[in-house]
């Protein structure tokens, strides 16, 4: 494998071409009248989606230089998606426009460092202006409006998500699952809880696309101990492996030989297993493990105080649940199947008594957190349809809408449809620049701020964007938007065309930051396959398998 250094105009041209391809593929999904994109798979039917992040992630150009550029963009999109779960389409539209305008300025001989200074100065002013526009989300109707917009105008999705928030509260746990039925969307409230601990190794992941561990009908082993060696849990691991069901281990920690053995057996396929740290610290950890035991029907939380040893545990003494979902940061236990509601209610009453008798505000707060986790439950959005393709496309929109709803509840909302970004233009009019090239950078952001609303209007089949923008900018009502569903101007909040501030803010921030990286990028070193590599690969004849690696 040889490598090549690409610089100058060749690099600039490649960046422009890749960004244009990505924006063309992703931008068509923007707005309620945006179109879908089909992503081919190595097996099965193509996936149909309007999820901008999925589209960006799937684009892998054959050319090594184009692939390197696409990977930089995909990494930024991934960070944007991790932060807020939505906004990658807006981010790609903004990035493409900034890079297009910067290329023109570079070709005219402008100082790129000064342009970058102007771009970053304008970015901070725009972010401050967005914060001043926000309005808090208070009502169920407003929550439904936000979810509807993010679901590309699907009111049923908006109403169901608002119903979930009403069921479990604004801080409650809401998950999305595929249903085997034909009903498009249904809501099910079940027992369960979520805590802030993720998987201890990424090798436990079962869904590599979303980096999740997803288990159905798992056993749950609870212990206050730290697991360093595999021997104490070997008997129960063998029993679980024979049962064919997954296992979740919740312990103070799992490390060393114990962790490596669990990972190895997961990779070999001998056991579907995952391990997470127990939530909390000290006595609170003990209490929360007790809560999980009550919820899942586990007979014991193994500790030094308990007479029973881990080696003597039976399957009947482990906890169970309908589903478990683990990310790198959180664990969600859904619908414990064997727990007694009487036991849960008794535990809830016990915590309420502790709250009443506690004299410490801090202790009361922690007890209330435990109470909320036990009593709040989990709302499950079940997505159905007549085909797998339809279900997956709808599930993408439901997940985007759910992320947007959480963002709106957290930071509030701003006028939607690209209007909020457009209205920040006014703050850039009075922004002082040090020189002409820095002013060029500010002007680039001015043009970029118009790109999202232009794309949304274009996707609706209209070429009237310049007139719409001119009308919005000449009047003083910053709640006025253009509704592409009705093709009329309307108030953002009464018509429900609103966006979560957090989504708009992060999409803009990431877009400008990514464009700034490309502005001063002077060279890329890319690997290119040589003829020798091709010959060596042909003569190697493959590595063969590694033989049968037994279980424990």
From Swiss-Prot:
GO molecular function terms listed in the Swiss-Prot or TrEMBL record: ATP binding; ATP-dependent protein folding chaperone; isomerase activity; unfolded protein binding
The cross-references to Gene3D superfamilies, in alphabetical order and at most eight, read: GroEL, GroEL-like equatorial domain, TCP-1-like chaperonin intermediate domain
What broad class of enzyme is this? isomerase
Query: Where ATP is bound, by residue?
Result: 29-32, 50, 86-90, 417, 499
**What PROSITE patterns does the record tag this protein with?**
CHAPERONINS_CPN60 (PS00296)
What Pfam families does the record tag this protein with? Cpn60_TCP1
| Transmembrane among keywords | no
Question: According to the lineage, what is the superkingdom?
Answer: Bacteria
Q: How does it assemble?
A: Forms a cylinder of 14 subunits composed of two heptameric rings stacked back-to-back. Interacts with the co-chaperonin GroES.
Q: What is this protein called?
A: Chaperonin GroEL
Q: Which gene encodes it?
A: groEL
């Amino acid at each position: 494998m040889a490598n090549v250094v690409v610089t100058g105009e060749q690099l600039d041209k490649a960046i422009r071409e890749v960004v244009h391809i990505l924006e063309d593929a992703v931008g068509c999904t923007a707005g309620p009248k945006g179109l879908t994109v089909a992503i081919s798979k190595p097996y099965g039917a193509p996936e149909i989606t309007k999820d901008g992040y999925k589209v960006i992630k799937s684009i892998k150009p054959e050319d090594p230089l184009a692939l390197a550029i696409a990977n930089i963009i995909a990494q930024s999109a991934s960070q944007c998606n991790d932060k807020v779960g939505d906004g990658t389409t807006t981010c790609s539209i903004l990035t493409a426009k900034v890079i297009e305008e910067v290329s023109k300025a570079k070709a005219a001989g402008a100082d790129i460092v000064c342009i970058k200074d102007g771009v970053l100065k304008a970015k901070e002013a725009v972010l401050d202006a967005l914060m001043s526009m926000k309005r808090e989300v208070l009502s169920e109707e407003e929550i439904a409006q936000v979810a509807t917009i993010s679901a590309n105008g699907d009111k049923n999705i908006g109403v169901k998500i608002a119903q979930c928030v009403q069921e479990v509260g604004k801080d409650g746990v809401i998950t999305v699952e595929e249903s085997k039925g034909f009903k498009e969307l249904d809501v099910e409230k079940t027992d369960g809880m979520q805590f802030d601990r993720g998987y201890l190794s990424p090798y436990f992941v079962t869904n590599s696309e979303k980096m999740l561990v997803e288990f159905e009908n798992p056993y749950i082993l609870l212990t206050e101990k730290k697991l360093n060696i595999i021997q104490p849990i070997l008997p129960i691991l063998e029993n679980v492996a024979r049962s064919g069901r997954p296992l979740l281990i919740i312990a103070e920690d799992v490390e060393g030989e114990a962790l490596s053995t669990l990972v190895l057996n997961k990779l070999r396929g001998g056991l579907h297993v995952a391990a997470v740290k127990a939530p909390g610290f000290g006595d609170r950890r003990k209490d929360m493990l007790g809560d999980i035991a009550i919820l899942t029907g586990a007979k014991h939380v193994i500790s030094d105080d308990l007479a029973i040893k881990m080696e003597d545990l039976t399957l009947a003494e482990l906890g169970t649940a309908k589903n478990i979902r683990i990310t790198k940061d959180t664990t969600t236990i859904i619908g414990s199947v064997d727990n007694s509601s009487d036991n849960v209610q008794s535990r809830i009453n016990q915590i309420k008594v502790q709250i009443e008798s506690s004299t410490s505000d801090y202790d009361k707060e922690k007890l209330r957190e435990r109470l909320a986790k036990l009593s709040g439950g989990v709302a499950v959005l079940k997505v159905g349809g007549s085909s797998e393709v339809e279900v997956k496309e709808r599930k993408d929109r439901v997940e985007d809408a759910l992320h947007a709803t959480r963002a709106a509840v957290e930071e509030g909302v701003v006028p939607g449809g690209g209007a909020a970004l457009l209205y920040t233009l006014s703050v850039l009019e009075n922004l002082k620049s040090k020189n002409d090239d820095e002013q060029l950078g500010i002007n680039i952001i001015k043009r970029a701020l118009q790109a999202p609303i232009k794309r949304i209007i274009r996707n609706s089949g209209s070429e009237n964007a310049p007139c719409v923008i001119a009308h919005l900018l000449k009047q003083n009502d910053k709640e006025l938007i253009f509704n592409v569903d009705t093709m009329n101007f309307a108030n953002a909040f009464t018509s429900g065309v609103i966006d979560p501030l957090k989504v708009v803010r992060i999409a803009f921030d990431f877009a400008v930051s990514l464009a700034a990286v490309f502005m001063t990028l002077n060279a890329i070193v890319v690997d290119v396959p040589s003829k020798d590599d091709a010959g060596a690969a042909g003569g190697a004849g493959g590595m063969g398998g590694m033989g049968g690696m037994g279980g424990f």
